[in-house]
Amino acid sequence: MDVTRTRSLRLAAAGVAAALSIAALAACSPGPAGAGDAKTDAGVLTVAASAAVTTWDPVASFSTEALYMGNIYEPLLWKNAEGSSQEFTPAIAKSWTTSDDGLTWTFDIRKGVTFHDGEKLDADAVVKSIQAAQERAGASFIWTPLESIEATDDATVVMHLKYSAPMDLVAASTYGAWIVSPKALAASASDDKYFEKGVDAGTGPYTLDSYDPGSKVVLKAYDDYWNEDEAPTYGIVDISITPDAVTAQQMLTAKEVDFATTVPLENIDDVAAQMDGKVRTANSPFNYVGYFNTLRPPLDDPKVRQALSYAVPYQDLIDVGVQGYGTQAHGPVPKGIFPYSEDVPQYSYDLDKAEALLAGAGHPDGFTLKLTYASENPAEARFVPLIKDSFAKIGVNVEVTAELFNQQWEKAKSDPANAQDIFIVYYWPTYSDAGSDNLNSLFHSSEKPFFNLSYWKNADYDALIDKAGTLTGSDRSAAQADYVKAMGMLYDQAPGLYLFDAQAVTVVPNALKIAPFNENYPFTTFFAPIEPAA
């Protein structure tokens, strides 16, 4: 398994995903099984959606086509949004248990479910799907803890792990965890273009009815969907692929579509008023961090890094960068995602304290730093000048360079000694465990820099998050406590600036009822729960 390659694919898409930081997200959660009334066909739901399709292969999928995948395919279980009464909702698995040591996970597979191609769902189909994900998924690395998997009977799947890990979170991932018809998996193994013909092989509430590349996706309600109580209200979802948020806004306000997944944030209140709707905000998994180059003076001194952390006007960055739709970060773990904690301290905006720390570190006259950000991220383009201006007030000159993300990233990895001093990054976890992802990927020591672009190495921090990672599957509260300690170290040592968590913002037209946004599936708009308001 090439972890570097698969994770780099996700980061390489950061420029595309950056549009989310300036657009209104319109996504909602899948409903809990059995929670709704039987539904009737409301006809056609028309949608303007920004998400492009890079592949229809549910195993390889690792990009914005997740918007559609979550309607066609299902995982073993769904991770519910923060604040839900239950952490998970059963999907393909009716129930699951784990051994006390967290090394064995047993899933009870739902009976009476069929794939869209007519194949029957059973435990063997689940095993084949997960084995395919291990071998070739874009997010194959999420299955790294899995030693072996077996179907002990038609309705039971047992996972044996190399080390304790949170397989409930892994099994609920938005990437690399879809359960796929074994017939389609076999066909795609001999024909890598099999799914690109418009084939789908999921168990979800919708089937892929048609696809016009770059233009239109049409989904059709699946007549034999297993969950009758949560069957779609709309028999057809007609989606116009509309990458430009302004165009989507125009289509929505002109009533050419019922719903738009992206609207420019600066226009969101006006759009809601025109639609006689409302603006709804929620957590999202998107987080902004500014790496310090801890290998090069003066940023090799924690006191200097702390001083600069006090010189960031955090609320101004939120107000200007994302129109106020964000919250100051408590470290690099976004709000609503494990192991987020408000017990993790934050730096305040305090120029007097910043100046005093700089003087105490031997830099009363300041110095010059080089800062880079992704040119394709308009939110960064808006808020980076505020950092430059504020640092100037304490005598620190910042030379700003905008580069395509991949260019910025390659330079940062290749020669840390001559790289940037500050690297702004827009990041989100692959699945709902920011301990194994954000805290590990962004700040764990590595022989060669890949994600840890602060180049920071701290053996105590490494040991703490390594330990926490082995506890998450068996004792999540203990893991949480260790992760919070680790984030306290990040605050004290300040290898990065922990800027803000972006919020998800939804325009809810008055003609529709839309379920709340789920931060665990940020790229997916779940269409089945959408209903006419009247």
Language model feature labels by segment:
Residues 94-137, 152, 158-163, 298:
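Aromatic- and charge-enriched surface segment that lines or borders ligand/interaction sites
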Residues 300-389, 394, 457, 532-533:
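Append "and occasionally in soluble cytosolic enzymes with long acidic Gly/Pro-rich linkers
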Residues 79-80, 220-224, 284-307, 311, ...:
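A bilobed periplasmic-binding-protein/Venus flytrap-type ligand-binding module shared by bacterial periplasmic
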Residues 223-270:
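Ligand-site clamp/hinge motif
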Residues 81-83, 174-229:
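Gly/Pro-rich hinge or "lid" segments in bacterial periplasmic/extracellular proteins
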Residues 48-100, 131, 201-202:
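N-terminal lobe/hinge region of extracytoplasmic solute-binding protein
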Residues 212-216, 312-338, 379-386, 413-534:
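Detector for C-terminal structural segments
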Residues 108, 141-186, 210-212:
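Surface-exposed binding/hinge segments that line
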